[in-house]
């Protein structure tokens, strides 16, 4: 049963007139408008955990000189990326749930889309860097301090920062050239390229091919290299002499490996739904998009706080607990 949206005549007229710069209507959770304030409670909780958790990780690393090492510089970059990804969706989500503001101008939609996809590509790159860091630390421990230096991390970080936006800019700019003369309803709380491009009333083959190429040569390539890195790590760990050495080596990889799973599993699920689930209910698309954008920023600080001993000890010390002295 389709859901009807009561758009105002002014909204519809303005959307039809501004064919090349439409105003989109974000539905959020269609059919559940009556309980939207209750729906916002888990979203607000995830926002608070994600923002406070990642800020806390940054403060812990900043205030603890022992954590001023390449591994934790990469963790800081991951926390910053998670903050950016989380904050990118905040304006429209807050506007819908608290101010009943569902409309978004095309320019604002482009900016939000640019931020979401840029930070997604950046997070993929950071996870690749972290896997390479663990690969060198376990497979070549004696050369770690030579290969992985603070200067190398800064250079790699700059590449990561520019890689995401450079890959995203053409996707976003190409949307400006398309007319949008049909429906202007987006079944999300935010703008995603896969959803916006479907509203264009012209041939979008080139845009789809370019978007697929970008995903293959960024996210998918990163995933393959990450899998190879952890495959080599597991091979090296399996060859260690004692079980205690194997356990210690594997423990250093637990947190970054969990971060990889938390990020890539929802992303692959969302991609499969968009590519092959065109007839799936809108709620499925919406659920997968929210899991992909909200869960990694929320869980990453928790994972590193629990699974990384140095972070755990630094948190205890920062909070002034007695265990810090042990």
Curated annotation (Swiss-Prot):
Compartments it resides in: Cell membrane
Keywords from the UniProt entry: Cell membrane, Disulfide bond, G-protein coupled receptor, Glycoprotein, Membrane, Olfaction, Receptor, Sensory transduction, Transducer, Transmembrane, Transmembrane helix
Alphabetical list of Gene3D superfamilies matching this protein: Rhodopsin 7-helix transmembrane proteins
Domain of life: Eukaryota
GO cellular component: membrane; plasma membrane
Chief location of this protein within or outside the cell: membrane
CDD domains with a match to the protein in the record: 7tmA_OR51-like (cd15222)
Pfam families referenced in this protein's UniProt entry, alphabetically: 7tm_4 (PF13853)
Similarity section: Belongs to the G-protein coupled receptor 1 family.
Name listed for the protein in its UniProt record: Olfactory receptor 51M1
Source organism (scientific name): Homo sapiens
């Amino acid at each position: 049963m389709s859901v009807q949206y009561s758009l105002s005549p002014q909204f519809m007229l303005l959307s039809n007139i501004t064919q090349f710069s439409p105003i989109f209507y974000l539905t959020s959770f269609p059919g559940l408008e009556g309980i939207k304030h209750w729906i916002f409670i888990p979203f607000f909780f995830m926002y608070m955990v994600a923002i406070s958790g990642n800020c806390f990780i940054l403060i812990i690393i900043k205030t603890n000189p022992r954590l001023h090492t390449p591994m934790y510089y990469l963790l800081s970059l991951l926390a910053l990326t998670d903050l950016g990804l989380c904050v990118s969706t905040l304006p429209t989500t807050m506007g819908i749930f608290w101010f009943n503001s569902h409309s978004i101008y095309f320019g604002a939609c482009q900016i939000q889309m640019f931020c979401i996809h840029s930070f997604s590509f950046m997070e993929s790159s950071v996870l690749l860097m972290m896997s390479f860091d663990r690969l060198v630390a376990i497979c070549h421990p004696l050369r770690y301090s030579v290969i992985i230096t603070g200067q190398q991390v800064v250079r790699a970080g700059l590449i990561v920062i520019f890689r995401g936006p450079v890959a995203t800019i053409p996707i976003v700019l190409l949307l400006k050239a398309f007319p949008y003369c049909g429906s202007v309803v987006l079944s999300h709380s935010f703008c995603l390229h896969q959803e916006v491009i479907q509203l264009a009333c012209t041939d979008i083959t080139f845009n789809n091919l370019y978007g697929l190429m970008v995903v293959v040569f960024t996210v998918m390539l990163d995933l393959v290299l990450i899998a190879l890195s952890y495959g080599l790590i597991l091979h090296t760990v399996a060859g260690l002499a004692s079980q205690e050495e194997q356990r210690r080596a594997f423990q250093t990889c637990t947190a970054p490996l969990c971060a990889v799973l938390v990020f890539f599993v929802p992303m692959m699920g969302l991609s499969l739904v968009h590519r092959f689930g065109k007839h799936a209910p809108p709620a499925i698309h919406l659920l997968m998009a929210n899991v992909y954008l909200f869960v990694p920023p929320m869980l990453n600080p928790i994972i590193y706080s629990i699974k990384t001993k140095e972070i755990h000890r630094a948190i205890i010390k920062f909070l002034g607990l007695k265990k810090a002295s042990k």
